[in-house]
Every structure is written in structure tokens, then in C-alpha cells.
Amino acid sequence: MVSLEQAEQIAAAIEVPDWVLTKSAALVYSCFGSAANAFESSIKINFPAQHAFVEAWMRARSHPFAERLPYLNPWHVIASILAYLSLIVTLRLLHRVLGKFSCRTLGLVHNLGLHLLSLYMSLGLMISARAAGYSLWNNAVGTSPAEWRIAKLIWLFYVSKVVEWVDTVIMLLKQNYHQVTFLHVYHHTTVFVLWWLALLVAPGGESYYSAMVNSGVHVFMYGYYFLTLLFPSGIVRDVLSKFKFAITKGQMWQFVFNCLQSAYDLVWVPREELKYSAELLQILFWYMISLLALFGNFLVKNKKFSHRRCVDAATASGAKEDTAARSHGDRTHRTRVKAGMTNMQLERLKNEKSTEMKLLMRKNGNGNGQKASLQAMAGSR
């Protein structure tokens, strides 16, 4: 196991620089800040009481780190989700105008980028948690430099949820509408809101575990998506196809681990010894239960669909072979019938010649009959 000293050195070396937060915030707000601020102003004018309530609640519950982390304005979060949902509806309505895109290059860059980012976040959180002296579960949120390092990684994880919305854009541009399900949209919107809440109230402590495990699963998930785009057919693709359902099962296992974490903290740990927000742990538990139910339903439906496709393909192949066999049999039968009719005609012709020969023999006598028979036989030849 890595010692605390070694973990501190590694964590410091891979720490997210503070300028990444400030520069990215300046860039994003320069592009979308005016629209987000206009949305907040409209809320403040039309719903002043609700706006004041949310602001007061945030001031009372915010962690000190929340003031240093960008993108935590709740009205900007709501505006982002509304923009995401509007984009889904717009791309769906304009499918005939826009046409169908392959999005292969975009998909390769997007999936590889999220694969590498997930790898960085997963390993970074693991090492930073070790450097901060965390145990597996029941960890408190502090304000030390080591915990600020963890808070920045969790913030990066939170921002990556917006980047993952590109998944939906690619599906819609490829017109794979069957993939944009209720589960897909529900998961992509709610997870963004819940991590906003975690960063606002408790950006560290127990939240490191969920972010670390989810990032680890996404390492394999986005790596799988990248490779399937890179190898659309062939031996590699055949091997990858065997892991299709393993990705969904891996996601479900992470939900199970998160449920176990919440149950351990809420049930096993005495409430006076609990170091993290009980409210956040309860939200995490029930949210994981909802995802387990939805992903389980998705897995069952997809397995049934894949089985039905295999059965349909086998049935179609068998029907094709039966049709070919019947066609070959019909041709053989027709040839045999034709050959049979020819033999019957020849037999009838011989019988007619034989009858004719007998009549001639009776009419002309033996000598003349023999001569006539010879002539008749010559004629038959």
C-alpha cells in the first residue's frame, strides 16, 4: 500500500491547478454568461420570494469551498438543464432538415477524451483520499489543503457531467432515437443536479467514494465506446460485443456499492459518530435505488431484444434454406416428370408399332408379313 507521504507527493503532482477553475469559468461565462444572467434576472423579477428563499438557503448551507468553485449558481444550473432539454427537442424536430450524421470523428474524440478524463479523476481521487487520511467510508468534509485538492477533483467530475451531454447530441445526430430513453435523460439531468448539491454542501468527505467509483466505471465504458467506433467490424469488434452487457452490469454494481456505503453510514454508524451529512446520504441511497430499478429494466429489455434478433436472424436463415431446397426439389421433380412422360410416349409408340406389325402379318400372310414387319421395323427406326 502507498504510504501517506508517497500519496501526498503523488497527489500534489497531479493536483488540478487553481487556474483551471478560474480560466474555464472566464471562458464559459464569456460565451453563456449573458444568457444565464438574463434567466436569473427573469426568475428574480417573476418569482422574487422563491429566488430569495433559495439564496438564503444557499448562504446557510454552503461549504467554505463553494465560494471558490465556479458553476455553482443554482439558476445557471437550471438554465443549463433547460438548454439541454431544449436541444433534445430541437434536434428531434429538425431531423428531416438536418439529415443523418455518422459522427464518427466526433464520437472518437469525445469518447477518448472522457475515457482519459475518467481515468485521471478515478486515480486522482483514490490517491488524494489516501493523502488526506480518508478511510473507505464515513469521512468528514474539512478545509485543509488536502481536502481542497479533493474538492477540485469532485468539481471536475461535476463539470464532466455536462460534457457527457454530448452523448445525447451524438445519438440524436445519428438519429438513434431509441437510445434517448427516459432513463438516459433522467440520469444525465439528475446526476448533474445532485453533484451540484454535493459540491455546495459537502465537497469532499463521503462524496469522494461515489465520484471515484463512477469515474472508474466510465474508464471502461468510454473506452468500450471508443474501441467500437475504432473497430466497426472484424475480430476486435466481435470480442468487444461480448462485453456489451458487462458495461451495464458494471454500472449497476456501482449503484449497489453506493447503496452499501449509504446504508453503512446511516444504519451501522451511530448517528453521533456520523461525519457526513445524513440528508445527502439518504438522497444518495434512494437515488441509487431508482437507478438500479431503471438500469435493471433496461438490461432485461435489451437482453430480450438481442435474443429476439438472434431468433429472427436464425429463422430468416432457415426459411431461406428451406425455400432454396424447395426450389431445387421442384426443379428435380419437374425434370423427372418430364422424363417420365417421354418414356411413356416411347412405350406407347412401340406398342402402336407392334400392333401395326401384327395386323400386317395377318393381312399378308407369313412371307409378306415378314417383309412388312421388316419394313415397319425399319420405319420405326
UniProtKB/Swiss-Prot annotation:
A motif (HxxHH motif) lies at residues 184-188. It is an enzyme of class 2 (transferase). It is a multi-pass membrane protein. The keyword Transmembrane applies. InterPro entries: ELO_CS, ELO_fam. GO terms for molecular function: fatty acid elongase activity. Pathway: Lipid metabolism; polyunsaturated fatty acid biosynthesis. One of its GO terms (biological process) is fatty acid elongation, monounsaturated fatty acid. Its EC number is 2.3.1.-. The keyword Endoplasmic reticulum does not apply. The active site is at H187 (nucleophile). Keywords: Fatty acid biosynthesis, Fatty acid metabolism, Lipid biosynthesis, Lipid metabolism, Membrane, Transferase, Transmembrane, Transmembrane helix. It is found in: Membrane. One of its GO terms (cellular component) is endoplasmic reticulum membrane. The chain crosses the membrane at residues 10-30, 69-89, 107-127, 153-173, 182-202, 216-236, 280-300. Residues 362-381 are annotated as: Disordered. Belongs to the ELO family. Involved in the synthesis of fatty acids. Elongates C18 polyunsaturated fatty acids (PUFAs) with a preference for Delta6 PUFAs. This is Fatty acid elongase 6. It comes from Leishmania major. The lineage of its organism: Eukaryota, Discoba, Euglenozoa, Kinetoplastea, Metakinetoplastina.
